[in-house]
Amino acid sequence: MKYELKNIKTLNTHDGVAWTASVYRDGKRIGTAEDRGDGGSTWLYLDNRADEADLVAWCAEASKNSGLWMAQYATETIKTHHVGGEQNGTATYELRFNDEMALAYLMEVSDLDKRAKKNIVFRTPRAIPHTSVDTYDTYTLSGRSMATETPASVSAALVYITNKFSNAEVWHSREHMWVSASEMLKDVRAYVPVQVGA
């Protein structure tokens, strides 16, 4: 089973980015999704409401090893404690993987896959003082695609990336996950499709 978003249309608004998309399961349209770009919820409209649990479970499982931000919520319930001072005490809430995170995962994968068709997409960690949140800067190596280049050409690009950014990760669109550039460099042929005549 595979879920994906197609026919994605975006529009910049005053408060963010609005978008609409068709939701597909195994190539068959099963509903639509939208974000109105007003800072509110993301909406999911499925032809059969029972499909929502399957979509959320599939996306949670698919995101676990992806390296994307929502993966941390797929593995367990995150319990966060906020201390509001001595007088206010501590507030606790639980955050579980839900339909909004599932749609965020599908949007992120769709965007990265689209960019990776014509470029090598990679990211590097960015340190933000006094926070434990994983933050990354994402780059593209234009005109180079792991889907169309020869293994030798991709190796040269990976050497450049690892020399410039020692801890870079490259988007692997076939597996929908971030892979360490240095790890990928060890066995490029495992990550690059076999080219005719290469």
What are these model-derived regions, one by one?
Residues 1-198:
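Terminal leader/tail segments of proteins
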